[in-house]
Amino acid sequence: AYGEAANVFGAPK
């Protein structure tokens, strides 16, 4: 879930 959300926030991970 986090990995997917990180893609939205543009986070490194």
Swiss-Prot record:
Gene Ontology annotations of biological process type: photosynthesis
Keyword list, A-Z: Chloroplast, Membrane, Photosynthesis, Photosystem II, Plastid, Thylakoid
UniProt GO cellular component terms: chloroplast thylakoid membrane; photosystem II
Lineage: superkingdom: Eukaryota
Entry's localization field: Plastid, Chloroplast thylakoid membrane
Further comment found in the protein's record: On the 2D-gel the determined pI of this protein (spot N179) is: 5.9, its MW is: 22 kDa.
Primary role: May be involved in the regulation of photosystem II.
Recorded family membership: Belongs to the PsbP family.
Name of the protein this chain belongs to: Oxygen-evolving enhancer protein 2
The organism of origin for this protein: Pinus pinaster
Gene of this entry: PSBP
